[in-house]
């Protein structure tokens, strides 16, 4: 079988959870930046939505991080990413969906406010306050969900942990780290794993992307859940400013 190729972007939480899974399973792969640069066109050709991460194995193309993890677990089942118990498996999948939608949208939009200057100041302030309150709520709920367990799937490292980790690392980098001791201890345990140490990113990559956006050489994607969150947060004027500047996209076109 040909070497797997992962089209990704280092700061994408969706790509990060896939990379952790690949490394925990000891599956070799090549990485390509699929968001900007020469490989972005390949992603648009291979994926109807032009989204990363995208996993390519010979003629097999797998898109969407959740589906990629399903594929990896079916093709390389050891070690498994989900518990054996059906109820725990359902809980793990629900947590992954929560991370991929609500929590991702919160941190994505907070990052946009912190490192761009789109829209009027009052709208930006409203979104920042809404986002900080949402993040605090999510962190408290995650701490309750973790409890005294070592991992979110109990005694085993699984896809729930891989889904939560990128967001909690991002909150720490953005100086909005969780206050709960059990969640912080879990974060330290996870970051000590070799599979995680290799995917941690600094803000430099995000700042470089924002510089490309300002220069007009890159456009950010407003996925549906991010757009819904921004409008609920009172950011309609910010969206209008971005559309006027033509620095976002809603689809491949």
What residues fall within each predicted segment?
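GST-like fold's C-terminal all-alpha helical module
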Residues: 99-194, 202, 248-253
